[in-house]
Every structure is written in C-alpha cells, then in structure tokens.
Swiss-Prot record:
This is Uncharacterized lipoprotein SE_0145. It is found in: Cell membrane. Disulfide bonds: none annotated. A lipid is attached at residue 20 (S-diacylglycerol cysteine). Residues 1-19 form the signal peptide. Keywords: Cell membrane, Lipoprotein, Membrane, Palmitate, Signal. It is a lipid-anchor. One of its GO terms (cellular component) is plasma membrane. Belongs to the staphylococcal tandem lipoprotein family. InterPro entries: Csa, Csa_sf. It comes from Staphylococcus epidermidis (strain ATCC 12228 / FDA PCI 1200).
C-alpha cells in the first residue's frame, strides 16, 4: 500500500524540472540551510517570534501559525503498518500551542483494501512541555506522549554542504524544490533517529528534502524531510518530518 502510494508521488514529481545542475543544487542547499542551520530548535516556543514565508493567502494582520509534525512509520514483513507521531499548531497571534499525538494502524479489509485505524490524543504545549489535555488510557502511553521530541528539536544539519550527488528537482512556478541523498549510518541525524526509535534494519536511509517558497527570498517557507530506510511491497520503514507556515485560519487540530 505504501509502495503504490509512493509511485503516485513520484509520477507527480515528473512535472518538475529535473537535472538542474550543480549550480541549482548549491542554490537549493543554500535555501534549505536558511532553515536547517537553525536546528536544533530545542525550545519550540521560539517559533512564536519566527517569521515565515507569506503568500497572497495571508491576511496582513495575521502573524501566521507554524505547524510542526514528526512521525515514524514501520511496516515489518507480514505485519500491518503502524505510524506514531505528533502534530503541533503554534499560533503566533495568540502565542498558544495545541495539537495531538496519534497512533495510526493500516490494515487490509476483507476486500484487500487499506483501512486506517487512527487514535488521537489531544495535547497542548506550555513552557516547552507537552501536556495531554484528556485522560490517557495507560501510564506508558502517557509518558511516551509527554517525552515526545520533534525532529526539529534534536536534528543538526551543519554538514549539509557535504551531501553530494543529489537528485535535484525545481519548479519555479509553485515555487518548490527537492533534493535526495543517500546517507550512511554514521550520519549524525541517522544516529539520532536510531537512538530514539527501534528501527528494525541496519540499512542506511535515503534523505529527501522538500521545500517551497522563493529560493532567493529571505523568509522561511515550508520544509519537509523524509528518511527512507526500507521501501518495497512487503516492508516499509521511514521517518517523516515537516515544518510548515500557514495562515492562522487554517489552524486545525
């Protein structure tokens, strides 16, 4: 199911301008570095004072809302796919943050079609601490939620310029861009993911960086990262992370 979904994504990427050359890769790296050089942002409340990329959808009086999202998905051979993660909506107008922790299991129904079973646990953030706003069914899950850390809080991309031979795509009309690199298990961020998650493979991941916003602009657009350890019809292991800046009226949780 994951495999087929990714095929659709790859087909859509074919509309992008590929093979941009070394100069475009350097330009894209430089743009990503405007955001990634700030990692780690250990205190998420710093987002209250951080400006983002604003398009025509923004009201002039709206300071915007940051959405941070981290999740790990594991589908072992012969078993269902499970995703655990958290989403926070950091509202710069009200300087309040709410969101939810979620556990999503994807199984096949009697007709072989994928079926989602997602459970959400609402949370808020105060003083950089995650606090469940409703009773949690067990202490283990409660601790898992309270101790959750977003990738943006511990990642470090100081060596991004050392990433070489990336697959580069750029669409100036959106504008959007992406870069894909093969990493090794000695990479700092790979080590951090293995430290925090029980990743059942020794295979090193590929890193896909996706972003939008003006490459030459000074403001920060949306940034999406995906570490794919295993991807095939029988088994999938991947970690995804997103930092997005949106109009506050689109704040949903």
């Amino acid at each position: 199911m994951r495999y087929l979904k990714r095929i659709t994504i790859y087909i859509s990427l074919l509309i992008l301008v590929s093979g941009c050359g070394n100069s475009k890769e350097a330009e894209i790296k430089q743009n990503f570095n405007k955001t990634l050089s700030m990692y780690p942002i250990k205190n998420l409340e710093n987002f209250y004072d951080k400006e983002g990329y604003r398009d025509e959808e923004f009201d002039k009086k709206d300071k915007g809302t940051w959405i941070v999202h981290s999740e790990m998905t594991i589908e072992p051979k012969g078993k269902s796919m499970e995703t655990r993660g958290m989403v926070l909506y950091i509202n710069r107008n009200t300087r309040t943050t709410k969101g939810y922790y979620f556990i999503n299991e994807i199984t096949d129904d009697s007709n072989g079609r994928p079926k989602d079973d997602e459970k959400r646990y609402p949370v808020k953030m105060e003083h950089n601490k995650i606090i469940p706003t409703k009773p949690i069914p067990n202490d283990k899950l409660k601790k898992e939620i309270e101790n959750f850390k977003f990738f943006v809080q511990y990642a470090n991309f100081k060596d991004i310029n050392d990433y070489k031979n990336g697959d580069i795509s750029y669409n100036p009309n959106v504008p959007s861009y992406s870069a894909k690199y093969q990493l090794n298990n000695n990479d700092y961020n790979v080590k951090q993911l293995r430290k925090r998650y029980d990743i059942p493979t020794k295979q090193a991941p590929k890193l896909l960086l996706k972003g939008d916003g003006d490459l030459k602009g000074s403001s920060v657009g949306s940034k999406n990262l995906e570490f794919t350890f295993v991807e095939n019809k029988e088994e999938n292991i991947f970690f995804t992370d997103a930092v997005q800046f949106t109009p506050s009226e689109n704040d949903e949780s």
